[in-house]
Swiss-Prot record:
InterPro entries xrefs: Bact_OuterMem_StrucFunc, OMP/PagP_b-brl, Omp38, OMP_b-brl, OMP_bac, OmpA-like, OmpA-like_sf
Organism: Acinetobacter sp. (strain Tol 5)
Function: Porin. Binds peptidoglycan.
Signal peptide: 1-21
GO biological process: monoatomic ion transport
Domain OmpA-like: 221-339
GO CC field: cell outer membrane; pore complex
Database matches in Pfam families: OMP_b-brl (PF13505), OmpA (PF00691)
Descriptive protein name: Outer membrane protein Omp38
UniProt keyword terms in alphabetical order: Cell outer membrane, Ion transport, Membrane, Porin, Signal, Transmembrane, Transmembrane beta strand, Transport
Gene name in the database record: omp38
Subunit structure: Homotrimer.
Length: 343
């Protein structure tokens, strides 16, 4: 009876332990059981010995199971054999053998790792409880005890949900100490799909942050303006440029070269000494003297330079004094223009 309790405990505990595994159902198993003739006819094989003979007959069963791993499963099984009972002296006597089993099976996937194969051989080991009910009242009407199962078989997969199942099984009766043998077949149904090994963890290479490409700031287009003045002073009745003013003329030339679109307006002036006609010519000559220096010495385009003489009409000082007249003998030039620069 101790083995019987162990078998029943396995029957209850294993499905609970695998509550999240794939569920298998074998709604009908058909086979043929061959009773041990040595038990039926031997001299010391148990309490049934020398009594009625159990005849071979049809095996019918059903099983409910769970897949514990992709290659290991557990099944709770009920089956029965109902056959003729000879040697009772009563024609038509029968026996009924019932079993409740808990069986583990391991498929070839344990070794091959070919989880998608169509044919899966397996081995089976388990234990259970049996009960005999006999029509012969001369002997024990009912007998029960513990049994062990060992078998080999194969699942023949039709698709992901259905498989044919064939098996050859030996069942050992611990209490009566005899074997019987069963060849059986059935249809195995998987609810929710077969278990498969977890997908391997793919190590993702760390993403190395790519340093952003330095973006050069967009160039700024700026406009620079040129506003410049030139003053050159002359001796009485002279139009030549004195050496002290030549550096100032050079600065104007440099600005005109830097600003290609710049222009210069050059104005000549005199004091009130002498006749007007003379001073008109002298004032223009002084303006042209500055223009000539820019063109001949610094290659400034003459078209960018305009000249005009004003005689004594625009004095900046009093012509009644020597100092005032010196201030009025002059050239005044304004240089204007602009250029576009990119920074």
């Amino acid at each position: 009876m101790k083995l019987s309790r162990i078998a029943l405990a396995m029957l209850v505990a294993a499905p609970l332990a695998a509550a999240n595994a794939g569920v298998t159902v074998t709604p009908l198993m058909l086979g043929y059981t061959f009773q041990d003739t040595q038990h039926n006819n031997g001299g010391d094989k148990g309490e049934l010995t020398a009594g009625p003979e159990l005849q071979d007959d049809l095996f019918v069963g059903a099983a409910l199971g769970v897949e514990l791993t992709p290659w290991l499963g557990f099944e709770a099984e009920y089956n029965q054999v109902k056959g003729d009972l000879d040697g009772t002296g009563v024609p038509g006597s029968e026996y009924k053998q019932t079993q409740i089993n808990g069986n583990f099976y391991a498929t070839s996937d344990l070794i091959t790792k070919n989880y998608d194969s169509k044919i899966k051989p397996y081995v089976l080991l388990g234990a259970g409880h049996y009960k005999y009910k006999l029509d012969d009242m001369s002997y024990h009407n009912n007998e029960e005890g513990t049994l062990g199962n060992a078998g080999v078989g194969a699942f023949w997969r039709l698709n992901d949900a259905l498989s044919l199942r064939t098996e050859a099984r030996g069942t050992y009766n611990f209490d009566e100490k005899f074997w019987n043998y069963t060849a059986l077949a059935g249809l195995n149904v998987v609810l929710g799909g077969h278990l498969k090994p977890a997908a391997p963890v793919v190590e993702v290479a760390p993403v190395v942050p790519v340093a952003p490409t330095p973006v050069e700031p967009a160039p700024q287009v700026l406009t620079e303006d040129l506003n410049m003045e030139l003053r050159v002073f002359f001796d009485t009745n002279k139009s030549n440029i004195k050496d002290q003013y030549k550096p100032e003329v050079a600065k104007v030339a440099d600005a005109l070269n830097t600003f290609p679109n710049a222009t210069a307006r050059i104005e000549g002036h005199t004091d009130n000494t002498g006749p007007r006609k003379l001073n008109e010519r002298l004032s223009l000559a002084r303006a042209n003297s500055v223009k000539s220096a820019l063109v001949s010495e610094y290659n400034i385009d003459a078209s960018r330079l305009s000249t005009q003489g004003f005689a004594w009409d625009q004095p900046i000082a009093d012509n009644k004094t020597k100092e005032g007249r010196a201030m009025n003998r002059r050239v005044f030039a304004t240089i204007t223009g602009s250029r576009t620069v990119t920074k």
